[in-house]
């Protein structure tokens, strides 16, 4: 897994901070005998320390150097995790910021000989999926509120990092989401219905004035409601359009970024089962009589997608009691037509030039199998250059059919190192990472990133 993730990090450095590459290559060469070169270790003095490719553990280390803040963070984490006072006092004795940051993430205390002494609380391995802990909305940052207890510590740590590092001095640009003030009055069943959780995989800053929000297994209607009010009440976010996409509450499609991602202005990758066009084509080919005989509440997955568009011009005064829902049914019939509409309206693409690439080339069983291994969860490094996993062969074929190249990350890195190519030369390409371990964690390249600054395209 380390090798896989290092390849991903090196790729990001080549595209975003190439000045760090000579140092990383030299470090790898000197420490080829080690499992992990020190340049990749956030707790090492030899860490590459880029200001463009940031690591949460390193950022946490920086704020832990402040004694007053260190005590607050330890106290907050221990309270959150239900630790004993004795455990909290033990953590307070760790004065080395790098060591403490590692403990707060892994939950592991070590003896002086580096052997494991004990677990003080569970690790947070999902911290690798930084997409979910925050969402950049132009120059603002929306902080997530996790749906599951396993990720709550990540939210707490990210709040400290955001308030005291990333947005220090600009705290007014941070947007927080929390439970309603009367949530505690609800009974257990009502609390399940009105829980407020939002995760970054369900929020896409798809254009400078257009935000997408998914209602899913992880992001609740209550959270979508609060985000809409928070955004529309703050014109400084620059957002006029908010489109909410309601998808089935399944783990296989826990966020909307597991169902589709943007590849190029005119191109998207999409899970075909959620496409109304694909559903209609299948029905036209052979009518599905079985639908008459199933439970009355049965709805095919592509028909269970619901889309809502809300619009408030920046020039208009926000009224909390006003309904900003607008009717787009004449141009958006489902998820695929929404993606086409975004390319047309937000990026100026001609209707006939919009391309949809389907997971597994829309062929069973590859479509579902490859969606499960993140064929739709791609990270765009620039317009038309995306990163994914190396195990989705039928999706690769669909990319090639649509005019894209597919190359393994290690092969591309060798071309960069040999001066055969530069990142600027790479166009219309799917770069694939090794994923024997990474894919098991249920998150792809899109999940493993949290863009803070985006170039205009």
Model-derived regions: residue spans:
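The feature marks the mature, well-folded catalytic cores of soluble enzymes
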Residues: 1-457
């Amino acid at each position: 897994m380390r090798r896989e993730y290092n390849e991903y990090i090196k790729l990001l450095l080549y595209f975003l901070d190439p000045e760090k590459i000579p140092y990383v290559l030299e470090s790898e060469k000197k420490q080829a005998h080690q499992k992990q070169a020190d340049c990749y270790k956030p707790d090492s003095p030899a860490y590459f320390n880029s200001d463009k490719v940031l690591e949460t553990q390193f950022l946490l280390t920086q704020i832990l150097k402040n004694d007053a803040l260190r005590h607050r963070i330890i106290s907050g984490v221990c309270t959150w995790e239900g630790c004993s006072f004795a455990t909290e006092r033990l953590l307070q004795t760790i004065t080395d910021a790098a060591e403490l940051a590692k403990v707060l993430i892994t939950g592991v205390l070590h003896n002086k000989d580096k052997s494991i002494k004990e677990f003080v609380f569970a690790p947070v391995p999902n911290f690798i999926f930084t997409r979910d802990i925050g969402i950049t909305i132009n120059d603002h940052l929306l902080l997530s509120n996790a749906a599951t207890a396993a990720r709550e510590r990540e939210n707490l740590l990210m709040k400290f990092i955001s308030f005291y590092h990333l947005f220090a001095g600009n705290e007014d640009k941070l947007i927080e989401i929390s439970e309603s003030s009367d949530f505690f009055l609800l009974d257990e069943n009502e609390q399940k219905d009105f829980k407020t959780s939002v995760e970054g995989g369900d929020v896409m800053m798809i254009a400078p004035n257009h935000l997408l929000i998914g209602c899913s297994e992880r992001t609740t209607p209550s959270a979508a409601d609060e985000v809409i009010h928070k955004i529309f009440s703050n014109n400084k976010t620059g957002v006029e359009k908010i489109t909410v996409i309601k998808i089935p509450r399944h783990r296989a499609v826990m966020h909307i970024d597991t169902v589709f991602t943007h590849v190029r202005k005119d191109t998207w990758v999409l899970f075909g089962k959620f496409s109304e066009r694909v559903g209609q084509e299948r029905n036209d080919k052979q009518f599905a009589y079985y639908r008459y005989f199933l439970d009355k509440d049965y709805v095919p997955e592509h028909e269970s997608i619901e889309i809502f568009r809300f619009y408030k011009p920046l020039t208009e005064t926000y009224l909390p009691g006003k309904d900003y829902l607008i009717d787009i049914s004449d141009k958006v019939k489902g998820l695929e037509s929404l993606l086409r509409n975004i390319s047309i309206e937000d990026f100026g693409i001609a209707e006939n030039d919009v391309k949809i690439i389907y997971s597994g080339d829309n062929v069973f069983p590859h479509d579902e199998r490859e969606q499960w291994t993140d064929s739709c969860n791609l990270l765009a490094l620039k317009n038309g250059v995306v990163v994914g996993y190396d195990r989705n062969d039928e999706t690769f074929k669909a990319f090639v059919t649509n005019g894209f190249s597919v190359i393994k990350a290690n092969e591309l890195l060798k071309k960069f190192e040999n001066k055969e190519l530069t990142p600027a030369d790479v166009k219309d390409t799917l770069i694939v990472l090794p994923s024997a371990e990474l894919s098991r964690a249920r998150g792809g390249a899109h999940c493993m990133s949290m863009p803070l600054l985006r170039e205009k395209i």
